[in-house]
């Protein structure tokens, strides 16, 4: 059911005859009647850009139907016309206005909804902090934006990017940015429609402020920063089906057998989990969810696990970002492997993602290593790109390398057992999973 504020919003911005006044930057008097909380930001550049861009976009509504729409401020506007090149094959539309706040984006949300978007990528909130608003104000407006999107289409995927780090010099201290990102995480926890992307850790330096490597002024991205943001988005957009829609075939080397056919989860399933001890303390809202399994199930012929977390998509075994923030569970091969062997696979992680590969039973951490650890000093790791993991098991010890660099020299493993893939936080993808017995 649409709330009255949403109807008022539609009346204000719907592209109909005589819309010029409605596309104008709202006067103080008009602002009082608009949805949202906190004042609109007012300065000459923004008040000039607002009507100019919105009038231009009003002429592009038909052409931009079903686009993946990027909504935000100057950082989003800074994509310019580069989106098609960043995400080949994906129809996209940029609805960023430099200087805008979360309330401004709420007011002009129909610039997005009028396109009946296939997906929406959100980055917003940094300018609210700059004008002295509390993080709770921005979070309330984002809550209203998400509610309006759901009212328009409850199935359209939303990617909510965490607010990027900045600097006290820009009136955006890390404490405020981190507080806002915590509110965003609380806001979307349990919301299947929204994927939260950790773009704060992606761009933060050791001090928690903007890493100058990625910014031209500790606020706006430089070209390397945009390349990094695009790389962070690609795995999520691929999982949603907008890019990388063709399966990448890779021959299986002589002596190896494939453990994943690339089409479905045949050969994989779940196994009973050990009973967990009940906690003496009440659970925290942001505590990880542990998935308990009572009996073994196999997913032969199925494209997804029963809960949808694990999915076979165009040759990739995807462990999706959990709506809970952290959801700890495992997918196992139905076959067990004794003796000596070599396991090879490739993996790709979203920023700060946490997963793992079980070698019979012990877990080898498989993460976005530079951000999530524990192997943070790897020279050959490729962030948000495909990396090769090779595990050689001999005489009860496992030697593991990532792109040729040693992760573990002699990890003890049992005599036999399955191969498993863990899900925790973020998205992890695996492909070309194969094994060669050495006996």
Question: For each of these PLM feature ranges, what is it?
Answer:
Residues 1-70, 76-81, 85-86, 115, ...:
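N-terminal secretory targeting modules
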Residues 35-45, 80, 88-103, 130, ...:
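Acidic/histidine-rich helix-loop elements
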Residues 67-71, 92-96, 119-124, 157-162, ...:
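Structural recognition of the beta-strand scaffold that forms the well-ordered cores
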Residues 74-78, 98-102, 126-131, 164-168, ...:
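Solvent-exposed loop/turn segments at secondary-structure junctions
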Residues 76-93, 102-143, 148, 159, ...:
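Oxyanion-hole/transition-state-stabilizing segment in secreted/luminal serine hydrolases
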Residues 132-136, 170-174, 377-378, 413:
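Short, solvent-exposed loop/turn segments at secondary-structure boundaries
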Residues 143, 243-439:
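Carbohydrate-interacting regions of secretory-pathway proteins
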Residues 165-244:
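Catalytic His-Asp segment of secreted/periplasmic serine-dependent ester chemistry enzymes
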């Amino acid at each position: 059911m649409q709330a009255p504020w949403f109807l008022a919003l539609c009346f204000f911005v719907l592209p109909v005859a005589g819309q010029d006044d409605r596309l104008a930057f709202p006067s103080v008097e008009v602002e009082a009647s608009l949805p949202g909380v906190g004042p609109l930001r007012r300065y000459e550049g923004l008040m000039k850009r607002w009507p100019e861009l919105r009038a231009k976009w009003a002429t592009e509504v038909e052409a931009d139907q079903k686009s993946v729409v990027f909504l935000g401020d100057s950082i989003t506007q800074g994509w310019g016309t580069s989106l098609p090149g960043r995400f080949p094959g994906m129809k996209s539309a940029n609805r960023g206005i430099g200087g805008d706040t979360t309330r401004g984006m709420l007011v002009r949300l129909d610039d997005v909804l009028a396109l009946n978007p296939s997906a929406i990528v959100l980055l917003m909130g940094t300018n609210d902090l700059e004008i002295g608003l509390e993080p709770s104000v921005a979070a309330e407006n984002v809550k209203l934006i998400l509610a309006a999107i759901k009212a328009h289409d409850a199935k359209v995927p939303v990617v909510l990017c965490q607010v990027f780090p900045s600097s006290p010099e820009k009136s955006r201290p890390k404490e405020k940015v981190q507080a806002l990102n915590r509110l965003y995480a609380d806001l979307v926890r349990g919301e299947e429609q929204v994927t939260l992307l950790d773009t704060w850790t992606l761009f933060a330096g050791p001090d928690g402020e903007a890493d100058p490597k990625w910014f031209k002024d500790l606020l706006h991205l430089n070209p390397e920063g945009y390349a990094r943001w695009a790389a962070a988005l690609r795995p999520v957009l691929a999982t949603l089906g907008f890019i990388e829609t063709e399966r990448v075939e890779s021959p299986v080397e002589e002596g190896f057998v494939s453990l994943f056919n690339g089409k479905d989860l045949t050969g994989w399933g779940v196994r009973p989990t050990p009973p967990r001890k009940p906690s003496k303390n009440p659970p925290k809202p942001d505590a990880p969810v542990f998935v308990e399994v009572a009996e073994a199930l196999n997913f032969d012929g199925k494209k997804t696990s029963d809960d949808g977390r694990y999915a076979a998509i165009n040759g990739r075994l995807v462990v999706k970002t959990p709506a809970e923030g952290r959801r700890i569970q495992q997918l196992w091969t139905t076959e067990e492997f004794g003796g000596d062997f070599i396991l090879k696979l490739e993996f790709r992680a979203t920023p700060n993602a946490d997963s793992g590969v079980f070698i019979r039973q012990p877990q080898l951490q498989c993460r976005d290593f530079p951000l999530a650890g524990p192997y943070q000093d790897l020279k050959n790791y490729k962030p948000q790109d495909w990396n090769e993991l090779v595990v050689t098991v001999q005489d009860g010890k496992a030697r593991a390398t990532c792109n040729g660099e040693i992760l573990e020299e002699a990890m003890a493993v049992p005599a036999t057992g399955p191969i498993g893939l863990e899900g925790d936080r973020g998205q992890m993808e695996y492909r070309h999973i194969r094994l060669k017995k050495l006996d």
